């Protein structure tokens, strides 16, 4: 997607980019318990510090939601990608981190499978090599991607509760899973 849409003539305003997630974090932070508020501040602070030092992180169209449930496989062959609702112009590294966090994670422990992650990155780089700055920031993007989906799930849960939506027809993914992933990813931070 990153290379194929490089010269795509249509535009879409940035949607759910980092500024959007900062706003969501600001809105949700008062509702978090003290430990979660500290965790959120930690990941945002690390992200701001590292991205200031490593600015060469290319942007373009990204899927923004490339989880297993948005792909179609026949055996080991990818046949289709679904759900382009979140298609956005953002940093490619977010798409890479989102994909690594789902496809290369051992659930339910949320440990990143290093062998799978390395295989993914090697294959990706045959199509689009990562910049030195992208490589330097990959760990914080893994954490930040987990934080974005933690925030999204908290936001959805909050809206469902406010609007009284309950029952089997409501898809509500567990925010705790992404929080656990965030904690796990922060363990690898070398900053």
Locate predicted features.
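A structural signal for short hydrophobic/aromatic patches embedded in well-ordered alpha helices
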Residues: 40, 120, 137-138
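A cross-family kinase active-site recognition segment
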Residues: 1-37, 57-59, 89
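All-alpha amphipathic helical-bundle segments outside canonical DNA-binding/catalytic cores
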Residues: 130-142
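Short acidic/histidine-centered micro-motifs embedded in hydrophobic/aromatic stretches
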Residues: 17-20, 43, 141
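Hydrophobic core segments within long, regular secondary-structure runs in both alpha-
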Residues: 44, 117-121, 176-179, 183
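Active-site acidic catalytic loop and adjacent metal/ATP-binding pocket
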Residues: 48-94
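Active-site activation/catalytic loop segments of kinase-like enzymes and analogous catalytic loops
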Residues: 93-129, 144-161
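ATP/Mg2+ or Mg2+-diphosphate-binding catalytic cores
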Residues: 27, 149-191
């Amino acid at each position: 997607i990153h290379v194929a849409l490089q010269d795509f003539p249509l535009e879409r305003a940035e949607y759910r980019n980092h500024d959007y997630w900062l706003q969501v974090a600001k809105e949700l932070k008062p509702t978090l318990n003290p430990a979660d508020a500290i965790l959120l501040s930690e990941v945002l602070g690390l992200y701001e510090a590292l991205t200031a030092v490593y600015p060469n992180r290319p942007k373009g169209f990204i899927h923004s939601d490339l989880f297993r449930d948005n792909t179609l496989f026949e055996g080991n062959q990818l046949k289709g990608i679904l759900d382009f609702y979140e298609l956005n112009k953002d940093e490619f590294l977010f798409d890479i981190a989102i994909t690594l966090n789902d496809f290369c994670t051992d659930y339910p422990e949320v440990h990143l499978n290093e062998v799978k992650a390395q295989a993914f990155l090697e294959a990706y780089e045959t199509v689009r090599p990562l910049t030195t700055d992208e490589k330097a920031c990959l760990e914080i993007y893994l954490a930040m991607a987990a934080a974005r989906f933690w925030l999204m799930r908290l936001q959805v849960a909050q809206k469902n509760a406010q609007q009284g939506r309950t029952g089997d027809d409501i898809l509500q993914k567990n925010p705790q899973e992404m929080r656990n992933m965030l904690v796990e990813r922060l363990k690898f931070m070398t900053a």
